[in-house]
Amino acid sequence: MGAQLSTLGHVVLSPVWFLYNLLMKLFQRSTPAITLESPDIKYPLRLIDKEVINHDTRRFRFALPSPQHILGLPVGQHIYLSARIDGNLVIRPYTPVSSDDDKGFVDLVIKVYFKDTHPKFPAGGKMSQYLESMKIGDTIEFRGPNGLLVYQGKGKFAIRPDKKSNPIIKTVKSVGMIAGGTGITPMLQVIRAIIKDPHDPTVCHLLFANQTEKDILLRPELEELRNEHSARFKLWYTVDKAPEAWDYSQGFVNEEMIRDHLPPPEEEPLILMCGPPPMIQYACLPNLDRVGHPKERCFAF
């Protein structure tokens, strides 16, 4: 009798247990584990690969807690890296070039500011040189998500005026972007999010400023996106020092470049900016104003 009850119990419970396991697997598959569970917690992540992109730019790949983890960073947000360097805590913001479509790792493309290369900054960049010195297997602390802007898809941006304010929703048909140097990383994040959705009609216009042609970060990725999605992504460069047979603009961002290569004010686009503060203050904002782009439709990362 006991054996019969045991068998009966097994027969009754097996389908339930099977269904439970199936539901759990489906749930786990649809909701990957998130690394950045709280913006107030630091998460140590291990360096697993370092790629030399050019003379001063590197791609750093860090492992997430498991191959099934995603970073958990909303589009438009950034992370902070923190490390103790020469006895002092150094914290710097960065935007990954990978996304939550990538499981198990996060990629950062970072320009290394070496000492004794820029007369105004003889010590170079503390964090970028620290990253350059890291060996495979070393860890560094990540914290996030952080930032005032989130792209929600289909042209919808949620923007907070400050950290304590509720977000204001702006829905646009086109986005104008001005990036300088490493300021390209948040732009690429938004561009990729828009283009990967075939039902997102938003058009991106990027004006990308650099010192020289060789300083153009992520150029292959940008031009591949432009070539494959020419109706949805417009790309233009300007460099301070142009080589011979240069097909793009030369000089600082100016009114003419904004008129020619960003969407007009009549389209009511959102204008995104990221780059050195002097570029934003003296080149972008005054010339955007001259062209007619209102301040409430301009956002600087």
Curated annotation (Swiss-Prot):
Organism: Canis lupus familiaris (Dog)
Top-level taxonomic group: Eukaryota
Family note: Belongs to the flavoprotein pyridine nucleotide cytochrome reductase family.
CDD domains attached to this UniProt entry: cyt_b5_reduct_like (cd06183)
Reactions this protein catalyses: 2 Fe(III)-[cytochrome b5] + NADH = 2 Fe(II)-[cytochrome b5] + NAD(+) + H(+)
Protein name, per record: NADH-cytochrome b5 reductase 3
EC number from the UniProt entry: 1.6.2.2
UniProt cofactor(s): FAD
